[in-house]
Amino acid sequence: MMNDSQVQLFQLYNYSVYSNGTISNFTNCYLINDEHTPIIESDGMIYNGQSCDSPVKSLASHGAVGIVTACFCFFLIPLLLVNIAKYWKGKPPLLKRRMEFIWITLLILALAVGGFAYIDVDRNLVQGAAMKIFSFTFQTALPISIAIIWHVISTYGFALYRQRIVVGKHAAHFSLDHWIFVVEYYAPIVFYVFNLMGFFLAALHPWTKVVRGDGNAATDGRFKASSVLLAIAWVFACAMFIVYSFVYKLDRRGRWVGMVIMMISILPRIVYQFLETWSFTLNASNVSVNAGLVFGLGFCPPLILAYTVCIYGWAVPSIAELEKEAIHEECRQRKRRTTISRDNSTRSTWGIGSEHDMQCLPPSYETMGPCEKEMKEETNEVEIASIESGEVRE
């Protein structure tokens, strides 16, 4: 412990000793106990000082939650890389890439950093930088998660549109002046206004009073307004899913089930945002809060969402693959119809099925698609080869 001369020097520079084993002048704070005893010189310089927010205590429940969260984030990276390799093949322009995976990358970063910072919450005698980092990343994870849902639903809507146009041949029903295109133009602007405002109000809040345990600062109007705005952004994203389902109809492959699971997965986190905003006892920035509550309602929903999106993206074929499959199926059907028509024409030579043949005449070459042109060229080559070999039908 300090001798009397050291105590007088500290008091000369407005330091006060507190019962929790710290000494501070409201600018600098140091631990003072048997293991950590700061030494002050006559000029005010302090040596052997251990900052109050240094992790000196043993690991506890908050640290275990942080470690588990960080591990789940690292396990998610291989799934994310598989999806990036699948959907970014050929390096498409940035605006045409699957933006949900960019947001998932940011979500992994936020949750991992927040998890590591949460480890030191129990180990710090006085909360400081670790709690600030955790609080910032924790509040950042929710708007990022809602942005992921928005882009997944947007991609789903585009997939339904391409399915109706390419596969269903309903291009005439969706002209450029259709109201859905006007909605799709303004909807992202409205969504990001609510989502970004919710982010700026909560994540960019001054954290000094919050980490010191000021319940009024942790539940002030900024956090309440942020909760409402983020909830509106989530509802708006869900509304766009309903609009897409109404206009383009539900996907027969059952992909809409994955959309519903993703939208519901983040709902507990939104509910917890309201709970912690109106009650400091449940607030994640409160060092006394139950760590299991923070993990179950704070960390788990974004992790479940990220895993669901990555597994869904890995299991479901991409839009390009669906269009390629539709084109190949169309080619097979055209070849089958051409073969049937040629067989019927052969039988009509003997007076069989002539009326049916008149209804199955192939289209002119100018109106043929690429598959029909290919079949026509193959037929001509076969007929020329038959003539040259003398195999002409009498």
UniProtKB/Swiss-Prot annotation:
- Species of provenance: Schizosaccharomyces pombe (strain 972 / ATCC 24843)
Localization annotation: Membrane
Q: Which UniProt keywords apply?
A: Glycoprotein, Membrane, Transmembrane, Transmembrane helix
Q: What is this protein called?
A: Uncharacterized protein C56F8.12
* Membrane topology of this protein: Multi-pass membrane protein
Q: Which GO terms describe its cellular component?
A: Golgi apparatus; membrane
- What positions does the record give for glycosylation? N3, N14, N20, N25, N283, N286, N344
Database matches in Pfam families: DUF2434
InterPro entries recorded: DUF2434
Organism ancestry: Eukaryota, Fungi, Dikarya, Ascomycota, Taphrinomycotina
